[in-house]
UniProtKB/Swiss-Prot annotation:
Subcellular location: Cytoplasm
Region (Disordered): 329-350
GO MF annotations in UniProt: asparagine-tRNA ligase activity; ATP binding; nucleic acid binding
Primary location recorded for the protein, binned into one broad class: cytoplasm
This enzyme's EC code(s): 6.1.1.22
InterPro entries tied to this protein: Aa-tRNA-synt_II (IPR004364), aa-tRNA-synth_II (IPR006195), aa-tRNA-synth_II/BPL/LPL (IPR045864), Asn-tRNA-ligase (IPR004522), Asp/Asn-tRNA-synth_IIb (IPR002312), NA-bd_OB-fold (IPR012340), NA-bd_OB_tRNA (IPR004365)
Family as reported in the entry's similarity comment: Belongs to the class-II aminoacyl-tRNA synthetase family.
Native source organism of the sequence: Treponema pallidum (strain Nichols)
Key words of the record: Aminoacyl-tRNA synthetase, ATP-binding, Cytoplasm, Ligase, Nucleotide-binding, Protein biosynthesis
Protein name: Asparagine--tRNA ligase
Disulfide bonds: none
Reactions catalysed: tRNA(Asn) + L-asparagine + ATP = L-asparaginyl-tRNA(Asn) + AMP + diphosphate + H(+)
GO-annotated cellular components: cytoplasm
Length: 523
């Protein structure tokens, strides 16, 4: 296979000084002097840019002609025949895509060790300054969300994309090293795992046609009825809210499995913490109890944070500084590392995000029951926005108070009341709590949640009925308890919540390439 063109990351990591190179990328900025033009070039492979220097006196005779354009497949008029140097450089604007050839030499300027002294410059794609939305000036996060198809070309979102890619790889490495099998669970399902009722329905029914036919039938005096039996699947189908139930089926055959895929919630909530489409990591372990679940979750989080600090140190350092500057000016985008349970957030200091991640990665989590957590909150003397009582679901303010002001580190709360947890969680002997757990971290609150699953057939069936579900819809799930049942446990990690934590970005819409939220499904 023909070798691909080198990335800037490869060139800058192992610089072949004095060697002739050909680079490709997008223009971040251009600066002109009497003797040279300086182009800041990025290809997104790393946080750094490469300075391309075009010496004006020497280059005019050697700039690209139409002959070079013919070497680039599917690029029409990449270089205009007979174009002068001035004309070519005029088309080199912020956002333009270019190819530059020349010698890599030590840079006499500050800020970079190397530069490319160009002898050949080709404009592959123009970005006219009068219409290209992302100019050299800084843009708000809100503005960039409206241009999500272009925002990866900014330094902040390119860094976030690289962190996302690195952490996705770390997820797979963690489980592969521990002999988990990766299982693909369905996106279209007939089962509701969480019971919240916030589901997207999947149908081939055409509402316009249905309305037209219903009107015609009504005008003729005939009732018009349509059921899911007439739909594509012959029954109600939905987008999945979790791959857990199907994951359990494979855990009870392969022992250790995990899923990693998109999930969907039709929750009509426009906040910095909610998405309608997001990714979940969900391991499931046969022959495991709730304590095993806690151990793996704690180890998993530390592994991911260490991987981010090791593999994305430069991006995290950049985000630590840059995201705070943007987020402070936008409501709802306060950097996570600067958040506090106090009414006035503390001043953000350089390196705060990195220090927080390092502290959480090495600190063992304090473990306490839900009942113990409620007592601590009730006796704290703190006036919370959401009042605390036994039986309430812990809110972010409660979780951050425990992690930041009581224990000063990660916390695992377990044994929650059964009324606020899902039907599949195993009942404790007291009959009022279930073997569930949440892993909480400073600056965010809950980052993972899991439980030991109910493995007894009769108890599970009773829990399904008590939760208001039709047992017939879960017949396949209860079969797992009828045939070769085994104790098992698992947990879920919202991948975007992890990314929020690692990048320090205050709005979850900024850690996924194309956010899906109520009334927003662009791109």
């Amino acid at each position: 296979m023909r070798a691909m063109h080198p990335l800037l990351k490869e060139i800058l990591t192992h610089p072949p000084s004095g060697q002739h190179e050909c680079v490709h990328g997008w223009v971040r900025s251009k600066r002109e002097t009497k003797r040279a033009v300086f182009i800041s070039l990025s290809d997104g492979s790393c946080p750094d840019t490469l300075q391309v220097t075009v010496p004006l006196p020497e280059c005019s005779a050697s700039l690209s002609s139409g002959a070079q354009a013919e070497q680039i497949p599917n690029v029409r008029d990449a270089v205009l025949q007979g174009e002068t140097l001035a004309q070519t450089l005029k088309r080199v604007t912020t956002g333009a895509c270019i190819r530059a050839e020349g010698a890599l030499v030590p840079s006499p300027g500050a800020g970079q060790a190397l530069e490319l002294r160009a002898c050949n410059l080709t404009v592959l794609g123009e970005a006219p300054a009068e219409t290209y939305p992302l100019q050299k000036k800084s843009h708000s996060f809100e503005f960039l969300r409206a241009h999500a198809h272009l925002r990866a070309r900014t330094s902040t979102f390119a860094a976030c994309a690289r962190v996302r890619s690195a952490l996705a790889g770390a997820v797979h490495r963690f489980f592969s090293e521990r002999h988990f099998q990766y299982v693909h669970t369905p996106i279209i399902t007939a089962s509701d795992c969480e019971g919240a009722g916030e589901l997207f329905r999947v149908t081939t029914f055409d509402p316009v046609r249905i309305a037209r036919e219903a009107h015609a039938a009504g005008a003729a005096g005939n009732p018009y009825a349509l059921t899911y039996a007439d739909d594509f699947f012959g029954k109600a189908a939905r987008l999945t809210v979790s791959g857990q139930l199907q994951g359990e089926a494979y855990a009870l055959a392969l022992t250790r499995i995990y899923t990693f895929g998109p999930t969907f919630r039709a929750e009509n909530s426009n906040t910095s913490r909610h998405l309608s489409e997001f990714w979940m990591v969900e391991p499931e372990i046969a022959f495991a109890r709730i304590t095993d679940c806690m151990d793996v979750a704690e180890e998993f989080l530390a592994y991911l944070l260490r991987a981010a600090l090791k593999d994305c140190a430069q991006d995290i350092a950049f985000l630590d500084e840059r995201a705070a500057q943007h987020a402070r000016s936008a409501r709802g985008d306060t950097p996570l590392a600067a958040r506090s349970t106090a009414r006035t957030p503390p001043v953000r200091t350089p390196g705060q995000l990195t220090r927080m991640l390092e502290d959480v990665a090495r600190a063992p989590a304090t473990r306490l029951t839900y009942t113990e957590a409620i007592k601590l909150l009730e006796n704290s003397g703190r006036s919370f926005e959401f009042p605390v009582r036994w039986g309430c679901d812990l809110q972010s303010e409660h979780e951050c108070f425990l992690t930041e002001e009581v224990f000063h580190g990660p916390v695992i709360v377990y044994d929650y009341p059964k009324e606020i947890k899902a039907f599949y969680m195993k009942l404790n002997a007291d009959g009022t709590t279930v073997r569930s757990m949440d892993l909480l971290v400073p600056g965010l609150g809950e980052i993972m949640g899991g439980s030991e699953r109910e493995e007894q057939f009769e108890v599970l069936c009773a829990r399904i009925r008590a939760s208001g579900f039709d047992p017939h819809d879960y017949r396949w799930y209860t079969d797992l308890r009828r045939f070769g049942t085994a104790p098992h446990a698992g947990f879920g990690l919202g991948f975007e919540r992890l990314l929020q934590y690692v990048t320090g970005l205050g709005n979850i819409r900024d850690v996924i390439p194309f956010p899906r939220t109520p009334r927003t499904a662009d791109f």
